[in-house]
From Swiss-Prot:
Protein name: Asparagine synthetase [glutamine-hydrolyzing]
Pfam families named among the record's database cross-references: Asn_synthase, GATase_7
InterPro entries: Asn_synth_AEB, Asn_synthase, Asn_Synthetase, AsnB_N, GATase_2_dom, Ntn_hydrolases_N, Rossmann-like_a/b/a_fold
Signal peptide start-end: none
Phosphothreonine sites (modified residues): T545
Lineage: Eukaryota, Metazoa, Chordata, Craniata, Vertebrata
Length: 561
C-alpha cells in the first residue's frame, strides 16, 4: 500500500502543486519522493512509500536501465511477478513486484500487460519514447485511483481524491475529480507541451471471466463438473491458493477477526499457510467492539481454536462518535452504511499501528458480495436475479466496501489484503450454477459454509453463525451502533433542517437525520464534491429505508430464535 500522485501539463508552479500530494502522506509513512520528468518541466510524479517488498530498492517512480524511457508509479501488489519473470526470462534490476509491468509492457504492450497481472493495483505508466501515458486499475478497484482532466489537456491522478481537490489550473477554477473505473485502462497521447489527450478507455476484464494470467498459475489442477463434492474441493484449492499468494511481504502479517464466517476462514487459513511457510512469528489477530459485543465473543472462540496471538480492542459510544469526523474525511464519502461500518475498522487500524508491528493486514472483505452473504438475498425472486445482484455489488465495491477497507487502514499506514477477491477464486465462484450460490434452508453463504464443513478450520458454531453486519456486531443487540448513532444525530439535526434537505442537498438528498449529518460533515471537508458518490448503498427487494441488518425482518426473527 502506497500513495501515488502525478501531474501532466501543469501551468502552475510545481513546487506549490506538490503540496497537494502531501495530503496522502499517511499512505506511505516510510519515505516520499517527487521527481520531474526529463524534457517535460510541467510533468511530475509524487510517491509516498509503505515499504512492504524490497525495502532497499523500492522507491518510485520505478525506472530501470533497460528502459530509460519508461516511468512507472504504482500502488499495489503483483502476486505472480516471480512466475512471470521466470516464464519470460526477464532480467530484473530490483526485487520490486511492480517492475514486471515495465518488462511485460515492453514485450507485449499495455493490454497484454494489464491482463497478465495477478494482483491489486493502480498505476500511471509513462512512455516518453512513444509519447504515451497509461492509467490502469485492478478488476475490483481494491487499490484506489482518482483522476482530474481538463479540456485543454491538464491531467492529474492520485490515490485519493483529497490529493487533487486543491490543485490549480488556469483554465478551470473548479477541477472535476472522479474515481478511475476498476477493470479499465486508459491510453493518452503525451503532447510536446506536456499536456495529454485521451485516446481510448478500455474495459479489460470482467469479474466472471477467467483471467489471462491463469495460464501461468501454480494452482493445483481443478476438477471439471458441478457435482457438489467437486465444487467444494475446487473452492478449497482456490481459497488456499488465494491466501498463500498474498503472503508476499517483508513486513509482519496480521489479520482482522470479527468472529464472522469470512474473517474466521481467512484467519484460520492464513495461520495454516504461515506455519507451512515456516514464518517465525505468531499470527496476530485483532477484534474490536464494545463490551460484550457478539463479535468480541465470537472472535475469541476462533482465536482460541486456531491458536493466534489475539488482541481485543474496546471502544465506547463516545469514542465512536468522536471518530466520525476523521472517518468521513478519510473515506471521502457520506454513504450511510460505509460510514457506520468504517468507525470500528478505523479505530482498530489506529490501534494496530500504534501498538503492534503488524503492517500487512488480511481481512474478509468481498465475500458478502461474491457469495450472496447479505441477508436481503433471502428475498431474491430467483437464482438468476440473485446472480445479477451479486455481480452488481461486485462492480460497485470500489464505491463502498473496498473503499472503506482501503481508507480506514491506509489512514494509519497499513496495507490490507483481501483473499476473497482473488481473480481465480472469484471467477470460479461466479461460474457456478446460480442455484448453487443462493441461500439455502434460511442460511446465507450456504455453499461457502458447506465447503469447509469437514475441515475443522474454525468452530462449527462460527461456521454456521448467522450474518452480522460489522457495524452491528461490534455492539450489543440491546444497544446497537445503529441505535447509538440515531440518538446522537437526533440532537444534531432538527426537523426544520430535514424539511429543507432537498433544497440544501439537491443531489443524493439525505432521507434520514443520520444521512443528513454525514452529508454535512462531508461538505465541510469536500464542498461541492457530492457526485463522488453516485448513489447510497441500500438492500434490494425489501423496500428498506435503512441499510442496517438490524432493521430487517429476517434478522429480527433470527435473533429471537
Amino acid at each position: 500500500m502506497c500513495g501515488i500522485w502525478a501531474l501532466f501539463g501543469s501551468d502552475d508552479c510545481l513546487s506549490v502543486q506538490c503540496l497537494s500530494a502531501m495530503k496522502i502522506a499517511h499512505r506511505g509513512p516510510d519515505a516520499f519522493r517527487f521527481e520531474n520528468v526529463n524534457g517535460y518541466t510541467n510533468c511530475c510524479f509524487g510517491f509516498h512509500r509503505l515499504a512492504v517488498v524490497d525495502p532497499l530498492f523500492g522507491m518510485q517512480p520505478i525506472r530501470v536501465k533497460k528502459y530509460p524511457y519508461l516511468w512507472l508509479c504504482y500502488n499495489g501488489e503483483i502476486y505472480n511477478h516471480k512466475k512471470m519473470q521466470q516464464h519470460f526470462e526477464f532480467e530484473y534490476q530490483t526485487k520490486v513486484d511492480g517492475e514486471i509491468i515495465l518488462h511485460l509492457y515492453d514485450k507485449g504492450g499495455i493490454e497484454q500487460t494489464i491482463c497478465m497481472l495477478d494482483g491489486v493495483f493502480a498505476f500511471v505508466l509513462l512512455d516518453t519514447a512513444n509519447k504515451k501515458v497509461f492509467l490502469g486499475r485492478d478488476t475490483y478497484g481494491v487499490r484506489p485511483l482518482f483522476k482530474a482532466m481538463t479540456e485543454d489537456g491538464f491531467l492529474a491522478v492520485c490515490s485519493e481524491a483529497k490529493g487533487l481537490v486543491t490543485l490549480k489550473h488556469s483554465a478551470t477554477p473548479f477541477l472535476k475529480v472522479e474515481p478511475f473505473l476498476p477493470g479499465h485502462y486508459e491510453v493518452l497521447d503525451l503532447k510536446p507541451n506536456g499536456k495529454v489527450a485521451s485516446v481510448e478507455m478500455v474495459k479489460y476484464h470482467h469479474c466472471r471471466d477467467v483471467p489471462l494470467h491463469a495460464l501461468y498459475d501454480n494452482v493445483e489442477k481443478l476438477f471439471p463438473g458441478f457435482e457438489i463434492e467437486t465444487v467444494k474441493n475446487n473452492l478449497r484449492i482456490l481459497f488456499n491458493n488465494a491466501v498463500k499468494k498474498r503472503l508476499m511481504t517483508d513486513r509482519r502479517i496480521g489479520c482482522l477477526l470479527s468472529g464472522g464466517l469470512d474473517s474466521s476462514l481467512v484467519a484460520a487459513t492464513l495461520l495454516k499457510q504461515l506455519k507451512e511457510a515456516q514464518v517465525q512469528y505468531p499470527l496476530q489477530t485483532f477484534a474490536i467492539g464494545m463490551e460484550d459485543s457478539p463479535d468480541l465473543l465470537a472472535a475469541r472462540k476462533v482465536a482460541d481454536h486456531i491458536g493466534s496471538e489475539h488482541y481485543e480492542v474496546l471502544f465506547n459510544s463516545e469514542e465512536g462518535i468522536q471518530a466520525l469526523d476523521e472517518v468521513i474525511f478519510s473515506l471521502e464519502t457520506y454513504d450511510i452504511t460505509t460510514v457506520r461500518a468504517s468507525v470500528g475498522m478505523y479505530l482498530i487500524s489506529k490501534y494496530i499501528r500504534k501498538n503492534t508491528d503488524s503492517v500487512v493486514i488480511f481481512s474478509g472483505e468481498g465475500s458478502d458480495e461474491l457469495t450472496q452473504g447479505y441477508i436481503y438475498f433471502h428475498k431474491a425472486p430467483s437464482p438468476e436475479k440473485a446472480e445479477e445482484e451479486s455481480e452488481r455489488l461486485l462492480r460497485e465495491l470500489y464505491l463502498f466496501d473496498v473503499l472503506r477497507a482501503d481508507r480506514t487502514t491506509a489512514a494509519h499506514g497499513l496495507e490490507l489484503r483481501v483473499p476473497f477477491l482473488d481473480h481465480r477464486f472469484s471467477s470460479y465462484y461466479l461460474s457456478l450454477p446460480p442455484e448453487m450460490r443462493i441461500p439455502k434452508n434460511g442460511i446465507e453463504k450456504h455453499l461457502l459454509r458447506e465447503t469447509f464443513e469437514d475441515s475443522n478450520l474454525i468452530p462449527k458454531e462460527i461456521l454456521w453463525r448467522p450474518k452480522e453486519a460489522f457495524s452491528d456486531g461490534i455492539t450489543s443487540v440491546k444497544n446497537s451502533w445503529f441505535k447509538i448513532l440515531q440518538e446522537y444525530v437526533e440532537h444534531q439535526v432538527d426537523d426544520a433542517m430535514m424539511a429543507n434537505a432537498a433544497q440544501k442537498f439537491p443531489f443524493n438528498t439525505p432521507k434520514t437525520k443520520e444521512g443528513y449529518y454525514y452529508r454535512q460533515v462531508f461538505e465541510r471537508h469536500y464542498p461541492g464534491r457530492a457526485d463522488w458518490l453516485s448513489h447510497y448503498w441500500m438492500p434490494k427487494w425489501i423496500n428498506a429505508t435503512d441499510p442496517s441488518a438490524r432493521t430487517l425482518t429476517h434478522y429480527k426473527s433470527a435473533v429471537k430464535a
